[in-house]
Amino acid sequence: FPIFEWPRIDTPKLSFPITDTVLEEVQAKEKHAINQIQLAIQDHPNDIAAIIVEPIQGEGGDNHFRDEFMTSLRQICDENEMMFIMDEVQTGVGITGKWWAHEHFSSRPDIISFGKKSQVCGMLASNRVDEVEHHVFLESSRINSTFGGNLTDMVRFQLILEIITKEKLLE
């Protein structure tokens, strides 16, 4: 893990098959995770800018979450002026049957990070970033090229997207 003392939240992952008992257990775990988040915000009121979550945790063991949990995360972000970021590096670009895994949930992120399946890495940002007057998507700086990409990768990814669309691979 990074050397920063970032708050880490227990994962309220689903277990399959989903029985009444499993559902009760995961609801209790979700409540615990939400309490951990609220405590972290209370303890660090000016230090937390975002909640970052994988819609399906890959490195954590193929962990799935309920829509209700993602909705709670979105609500916490809205109530605390935080960004809701979905890490789609392992789950994006059609791997779940939709372009993005977060599309299986009712809540939408402010920022999406992606990579691997697209053979390029990057991020998509909603207009919510415009709430910050001077941000890296708007203001030129020496670090912009870090996530700026290159022409070869962009052309390759465009061709990948065209093939997925033409072949109707997500239908």
Question: Model regions: which residues?
Answer:
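Conserved N-terminal phosphate-binding loop of PLP-dependent enzymes in the Aspartate aminotransferase
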Residues: 1-171
